Amino acid sequence: MKIRIAARGSKLSRIQVDMLGEKLKKIGIEYEIIDIKTKADLFSTEPLSKLGKGVFEKEVNEAVLEGKADIAVHSMKDILSEINPSLEIFAVLERDPPYDILIAEKNLDKLDSNITIGTSSIRRKNFLKYIKPEINTKDIRGNVDTRIRKYLSKEYQGLILAEASLKRLNMTMNYHRLNVYDFTPEANQGIIVALGRKKDEKIKEIFKEINHKDTLDEALAERAVISLVGGGCHSPIGVLFKKEGKEFYGIASYSDGKKKITVSISKPGDPYTIGSELGLLLKKEMKNENIIP
């Protein structure tokens, strides 16, 4: 049997598909890749904030819904909290490091004033502004290779990226891992997900064999948070869960650049309940600070 996998045509997307494909090969399943151009690819120089939601996933998911592919593969942080009702999460791979990293000559504490750090994420911009208000940020688009090239050409004095991207691309840049209390990652950062059609029971059963349950539980808990308070590349909210045995350890943070709210939780339970509880904690604190009505 051969599975048709839809994904963006970028180098990183190809690597992510091949990571999943290797898991399929181990259970005797072949795969082929179907390259899809997304809105984010077609408007690669536009700020993400101007492109709307779902810019990395919509066209890829449509290929599955239209029967042109069997599976859509994404970096899970790029998919909306509300998945198309005809689609379902079939599997996730074991999580890569979920952290944000700083690529710069010095670590965060020792950065000079008035330098420019490249990031298009409002979450990263606000967290950085809260810690280091004297540092400037500037939007940066393009794949990881392009961003690093701009940094090396001194267009930026630093970059903030996802550590998982560098790991998957096997890049050996020196970097500084950012503390999760200072830079709480975007929900589902570091997770590769496979989406399929709900009705495809045969394919769904195949993907159960490669699913990493603890990672899926962490992902679902984080998604429960953002379904209550918002999240994604347009949101100033970060959330991270770590599951150890039956225990969930979670942190969620919000910042507008001037003030910061962080809440945490540690308890056993099911992902949705634990995530919802953390989301309600953050929502309560945001209301107390008059951030939301």
Swiss-Prot record:
Cofactor(s) demanded: dipyrromethane
EC number of this enzyme: 2.5.1.61
Recorded metabolic or biological pathway in which this protein acts: Porphyrin-containing compound metabolism; protoporphyrin-IX biosynthesis; coproporphyrinogen-III from 5-aminolevulinate: step 2/4
Catalytic activity annotation: 4 porphobilinogen + H2O = hydroxymethylbilane + 4 NH4(+)
CDD domains assigned to the protein according to its UniProt record, in alphabetical order: PBP2_HemC_archaea (cd13644)
Any one of the GO BP annotations: protoporphyrinogen IX biosynthetic process
Superkingdom of this protein's organism: Archaea
Cofactor: binding details: Binds 1 dipyrromethane group covalently.
Residues modified as S-(dipyrrolylmethanemethyl)cysteine: C233
Keyword Translocase: no
Gene3D superfamilies for the chain: Periplasmic binding protein-like II (3.40.190.10), Porphobilinogen deaminase, C-terminal domain (3.30.160.40)
Entry keyword set: Porphyrin biosynthesis, Transferase
Classification via Pfam families: Porphobil_deam (PF01379), Porphobil_deamC (PF03900)
GO molecular function, one term: hydroxymethylbilane synthase activity
Gene Ontology cellular component list: cytoplasm
Top-rank EC class of the record's enzyme: transferase
Family to which this protein belongs: Belongs to the HMBS family.
Misc: The porphobilinogen subunits are added to the dipyrromethane group.
Main function: Tetrapolymerization of the monopyrrole PBG into the hydroxymethylbilane pre-uroporphyrinogen in several discrete steps.
Designated name of the protein: Probable porphobilinogen deaminase
Organism whose genome encodes this protein: Saccharolobus islandicus (strain M.14.25 / Kamchatka #1) (Sulfolobus islandicus)
